[in-house]
Amino acid sequence: MLERIGGARRCFRLSQKPAHSNGTSPPTRTEPGLLTSTARTDPQVLGWLKRRLGRDRTARKLYGSIVTQARRPAFYAAWGVPDTPQGRFEMVVLHLALVVRRLTREGADGQRLARALNEHFIVDMDDTMREMTFGDLRVPREIKQVTAALLDRHKAYSEALAEPQASKLQEAITAQLHYLGDSGQFDMVGLADYMRRAASALDPVPGARLLDGNLDWPQPDGGTAS
């Protein structure tokens, strides 16, 4: 499945220079005309819609930050991750898993935002596949597999980060990246160390700042890149 994600060009293309800090993200799908005239004036409905739109905007902001960080050259040049659609996919999902892990600690609001962020990723993948002219019957099957891969990685990385042994995270990363090539080409120690530093950088971010879409990423080679 992942070997066939060759069209993740819009979000996963690795630029030769560091991406801009604001990142890029696809437009949100809108469904005009879904609300009846009564619903448009109902305070509860309007309140729900306002919260949903705000959450979607925040998810787009977070996703842009994730993609920007995942495109940093060090992952590919220094640590051996292939500079291919599949390699970039894995780096985006790795960072997505870190953010979702942190969001789920922020109660109901954080869990809803984590869900919106995952949905934003899936919509982006769906759009990308359709741009590749995948058939309408094929796209749902591919998206089902992408969703399963996403959830598997969320679980594997979260469980490994909870273990004190550094080897557990290295093993989890190896298990997810093995299909990209000979595991000997990857610097698993460097990747695992970065992932722990990234988790440590996200942990102290105040909940209000996080729920407003602000992330603090470490530089792959040290320092901090917001």
Q: Which residues make up each language-model segment?
A:
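Residue-identity detector for glycine
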Residues: 6-7, 23, 33
